[in-house]
Design a protein with these regions (language model features):
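Internal alpha-helical scaffold of NAD(P)-dependent oxidoreductase catalytic cores
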Residues: 24, 98-107, 114-210, 235-242, ...
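Structural motif
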Residues: 30, 46-50, 86-88, 129, 131-134
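Rossmann-like NAD(P)(H) cofactor-binding subdomain of soluble oxidoreductases
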Residues: 46, 54-117
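NAD(P)+-binding Rossmann beta1-loop-alpha1 motif at the extreme N-terminus of oxidoreductases
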Residues: 1-46
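NAD(P)-dependent Rossmann-like dehydrogenase/reductase catalytic/cofactor-binding core
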Residues: 2-3, 43, 188-271
Length: 271
């Protein structure tokens, strides 16, 4: 059994705990009764960062992770402990932390969870992605995951590529939702049944059947898609790239979404 620490006990933190429940696990969350941060880090070989990354001023807000890493790295510097970032962070973040704390070992490994089925998804992954530049870190993290998921497709890569995978997946699915809503509107105008059209489309193996549903609320909401598409738009602007498509998707969502639930969900949007 491995000694694991979880920092942040929300959906992602609980998913990590559920995944590795046969190991020795401690968790810290400042908002609930939990083990003190110092004890979690000192007693853990692998420390999973499962903290919120809300958006603020049209870009990602990493302040919660920043605040925690300042304390965590005091205990991980010059040790064999590995910090595994599970939080969704914009590409380049893990490298930034590696340079800021060069005596600590970092890895990025994204989660791909549906909010309503996060425990089920956590133990039935399509693939596992391990992003680390240090080959020894890769080897140790892969060994941890291989013991739990011996038959799951596993990718080894650098942390920035791993971070990009998460944003590509989430923002593509958000775009797919908006496209489905637009075709739904067309079908209504033409007085035809969208669900019948959809049924004939999704048998095409290239399409994938998920995220074609259109809800009464329209568009997308929740904890992930809104903050992630805003964060990626912000990164594009920081890199002087053109985010026209992403901006169009987000603006369309703001226009059609009846319930902007992300405004009220804690840690999705910072004040």
């Amino acid at each position: 059994m491995a000694n694991l620490g979880i920092i942040g006990y929300g959906i992602v933190g609980k998913a990590v705990e559920h995944t590795f429940k046969d190991n020795n696990i401690l968790y810290y969350d400042k908002f609930i009764k939990s083990t003190p941060l110092k004890e979690v880090v000192e007693k853990s070989e692998f420390i999973f960062i499962c903290l919120p990354t809300p958006f603020k001023n049209d870009k990602i807000d990493l302040s919660i992770i920043d605040e925690n890493l300042k304390e965590i790295t005091k205990l991980t510097d010059n040790t064999n402990k590995i910090i595994i970032i599970k939080s969704t962070v914009v590409p380049g973040t893990t490298i930034k932390y590696s340079r800021l704390y060069p005596k600590t070992k970092f890895c990025f490994s994204p989660e791909f969870l549906r909010e309503a089925h996060y425990l089920e998804d956590a133990v039935n992954p399509d693939r596992i992605i391990i992003g680390a530049d240090d080959l020894d870190v890769r080897k140790r993290v892969i060994s941890l995951f291989k013991k739990r998921f011996p038959n799951v497709l596993m990718f080894e890569t650098d942390p920035t590529s791993a971070e990009t995978v998460k944003y590509m997946a989430n923002c593509f699915l958000a775009t797919k939702v908006i496209f489905a809503n637009e075709i739904h509107d067309l079908c209504q105008k033409l007085k035809i049944d969208y669900n019948k059209v959809k049924e004939m489309v999704i048998v095409d193996k290239r399409m994938g059947s998920s995220h074609f549903g259109v809800t009464n609320e329209k568009g997308f909401g929740g904890k992930c898609f809104p903050k992630d598409i805003v964060a990626l738009i912000g990164l594009y602007k920081d890199l002087n790239l053109d985010p026209t498509l992403l901006e169009t998707v987000w603006k369309k969502n703001l226009k059609i979404r009846k319930v902007k639930d992300w405004e009220d969900i804690p840690f999705v949007k910072s004040d």
